[in-house]
Regions:
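Short amphipathic alpha-helix adjacent to the substrate-entry channel of hydrolases
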Residues: 82-102
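Gly/Ser-rich "nucleophile elbow"/oxyanion-hole loop immediately N-terminal to the catalytic nucleophile
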Residues: 108-149
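Alpha/beta-hydrolase-fold serine-hydrolase catalytic core, especially in secreted/extracellular enzymes
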Residues: 229-290
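The feature captures the conserved acid-bearing segment of alpha/beta-hydrolase catalytic domains
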Residues: 162-225
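Hydrolases whose catalytic domains are alpha/beta-hydrolase-1, hotdog thioesterase
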Residues: 150-155, 175
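N-terminal cap/lid segment of alpha/beta-hydrolase-fold proteins
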Residues: 5-66
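Short beta-strand element of the alpha/beta-hydrolase
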Residues: 67-76
């Protein structure tokens, strides 16, 4: 388990936590710590969308009895649901159920986006297939790299989600601008530092999504820092790790703030305000909002 520590907040309910966070100064660093709630983990939970279509996912259920948001996380190319396990767990400690899904890891990513849209529609209609405590009006989509493109495509295809969070997303071809122009839900883009870790066509997301999008880059972060498995990936002797835990924690804190913002306010403004000190300090840079 990463060494984040646990918040000193002790709300009795999700509503109490929500009230506290919305009535105090928004600060992304608060979310570097794990949240106050216990989490029940269900590995390899099978979602049966039809008699022929099944999706494997890991489910992280937050303890409160109230209805709560659902955050769905999608990996990128040549990656897996396990690469986002700690992010999903961390979100659930803050009162947001999480589902890390496994789709074909080599794409096609337009197809994965459409599968994601079908899955969200299915959950929206029948939340009890996961848990009766899911608030279907507060489903948030999160995707890393090409998974970020798939999230954008799902939103463009009309997935009934409250918004999306793109973790250092990469574009997937000439049709991306047309998909991006169709998005009418709020989006937060959390990018790595392009000086060290450029990805393909990241700039098109802010360029072509018409409105309701905000973007920040995390200084010195790599593309892999936008992932966060429960156990670090093995590395060759004498090589530097692809990801740094400190920067992974920075990513997960920004992700948690953005997910809370989208779920509980319907826009990115809470998260944007929470980033203000990090922007002033230069930890977050290349900031854009429209």
């Amino acid at each position: 388990m990463p060494s984040t520590g646990v918040t000193s907040l002790k709300p009795a309910t999700l509503s109490e936590l929500q009230g506290y966070l919305l009535n105090h100064k928004a600060d992304v660093d608060l979310f570097r710590l794990r949240g106050p709630f216990d989490v029940a983990t269900h590995k390899d939970h099978e979602l049966r969308l039809s008699t022929t279509e099944r999706i494997d996912a890991d489910l992280y259920l937050s303890a409160p009895a109230e209805k709560a948001p659902l955050v769905i996380l999608l990996h990128g190319d040549d990656s897996s649901k396990e690469d986002h396990a700690y992010q999903a767990l961390h979100l659930a400690t803050w009162g947001m159920h999480s589902l890390a899904v496994q789709l074909p890891k080599d794409g096609p990513w337009v197809g994965n986006g459409r599968t994601l849209a079908r899955m969200v529609t299915f959950i929206h209609r029948q939340p009890e297939i996961i848990d009766s405590r899911i608030d279907v009006n507060k489903i948030i989509l999160v995707g890393h790299s090409f998974g970020g493109a798939a999230v954008a495509i799902a939103l463009a295809e009309g997935a009934p989600a409250a918004g999306g969070i793109l973790l250092d997303p990469a574009g997937v071809g000439k049709d991306m601008p047309a998909f991006l122009r169709k998005i009418d839900k709020p989006v937060m883009l959390l990018g790595a530092d392009e000086r060290y870790s450029p990805v393909r066509d990241r700039r098109i997301f802010y360029e072509y999504i018409r409105s309701g999008i905000a973007e920040v880059s995390i200084r010195d972060a790599s593309h892999e820092d936008a992932q966060f498995p429960l156990e670090p990936a093995p590395q060759e002797p004498g090589t530097d790790p692809a990801a740094t835990e400190e920067l992974q924690i920075t990513f997960v804190s920004a992700l948690t703030s953005a997910a809370f913002s989208l779920a509980h306010t319907g826009n990115v403004d809470f998260a944007w305000t929470s980033f203000s000190d990090a922007i002033k300090d230069g930890k977050f840079f290349d900031v854009l909002k429209k």
